[in-house]
C-alpha cells in the first residue's frame, strides 16, 4: 500500500527543517562573532574586550533562546580548547582562572535577558533593562569567582578592591556597548528573521 503525502505538508516540514538549519547557522555565526570580539583586547586585571558587546548583540538580534544558545556554544568552543577567549586563549584552565567567572557569567547574563524577553516582551526598554540586569549578574558572578580564586592563589583581598579592579573601570564602556547593541539590533533584527 502506498501513502501519498500532500504537497502542502511536505513543504511545511521542509520549511521547518530549513528554519532550524538557519537558526543553527545564526547561532554558530554569533558564537564566532563573540570570539572575534574577545580577540579585540586591552590587557588589564580583567582584560578589556568586546565580549559583553558580542553577548548583547547575540541576544538582541537572535532573541533570548537562540542568543543564549550562541553564548553557550561560544563557551563550549573555549572549553574544548579553541582559542576564542581574550588573548587567543582557550581551554578549561582559562575558565578556572581568576577571570573565568566573568566568561561563565556571560551565560547567566544571556539567561537573564531571555527570561526578561519571555515575561515582558521584546520592546526596546525591556531589552535595555534586561541587558543592564544581565550585566549586573555577570559582574556579581565574576567578582565572586575572582575573590575566591585570587584568595587561593595570591591571598585574600577586599570586595571594594576587587570591584575597583574588575568592575568599576568597565561600567561606562559596558553601558556604551549596550547602547551600540541596541542600535545594531534595530538595523539587523528585521533582516535576520529567526524569532
Model feature map: region roles:
Residues 33, 37, 41, 58, ...:
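Alpha-helical membrane-inserting segments
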Residues 2-70, 80:
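Hydrophobic transmembrane alpha-helices
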Residues 3-5, 78-84, 150-160:
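Peri-membrane helix termini and adjoining interfacial loops of integral membrane proteins
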Residues 38-50, 75-109:
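Interfacial aromatic-anchored transmembrane helix boundaries in multi-pass membrane proteins
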Residues 16-20, 44-45, 86-87, 92, ...:
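Helix-boundary and loop/linker segments of multi-pass membrane transporters
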Residues 3-14, 29, 36, 92-140:
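Short helix-perturbing small/polar motifs within transmembrane alpha-helices
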Residues 24-29, 53, 57, 67-73, ...:
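Hydrophobic alpha-helical transmembrane segments
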Residues 122-195:
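Membrane-embedded alpha-helical hairpins and interfacial helices in multi-pass inner-membrane proteins
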Amino acid at each position: 500500500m502506498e501513502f501519498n503525502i500532500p504537497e502542502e505538508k511536505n513543504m511545511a516540514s521542509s520549511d521547518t527543517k530549513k528554519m532550524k538549519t538557519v537558526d543553527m547557522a545564526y547561532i554558530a555565526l554569533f558564537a564566532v562573532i563573540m570570539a572575534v570580539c574577545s580577540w579585540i583586547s586591552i590587557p588589564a586585571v580583567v582584560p578589556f574586550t568586546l565580549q559583553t558587546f558580542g553577548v548583547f548583540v547575540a541576544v538582541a538580534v537572535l532573541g533570548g533562546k537562540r542568543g543564549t544558545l550562541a553564548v553557550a556554544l561560544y563557551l563550549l568552543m573555549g572549553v574544548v580548547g579553541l582559542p576564542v577567549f581574550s588573548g587567543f586563549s582557550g581551554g578549561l584552565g582559562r575558565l578556572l582562572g581568576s577571570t573565568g567567572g566573568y566568561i561563565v557569567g556571560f551565560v547567566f547574563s544571556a539567561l537573564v535577558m531571555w527570561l526578561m524577553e519571555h515575561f515582558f516582551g521584546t520592546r526596546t526598554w525591556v531589552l535595555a533593562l534586561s541587558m543592564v540586569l544581565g550585566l549586573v549578574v555577570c559582574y556579581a558572578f565574576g567578582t565572586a569567582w575572582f575573590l575566591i580564586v585570587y584568595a587561593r592563589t595570591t591571598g585574600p583581598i577586599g570586595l571594594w578592591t576587587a570591584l575597583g579592579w574588575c568592575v568599576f573601570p568597565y561600567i561606562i564602556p559596558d553601558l556604551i556597548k549596550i547602547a551600540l547593541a541596541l542600535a545594531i539590533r534595530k538595523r539587523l533584527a528585521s533582516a535576520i528573521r529567526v524569532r
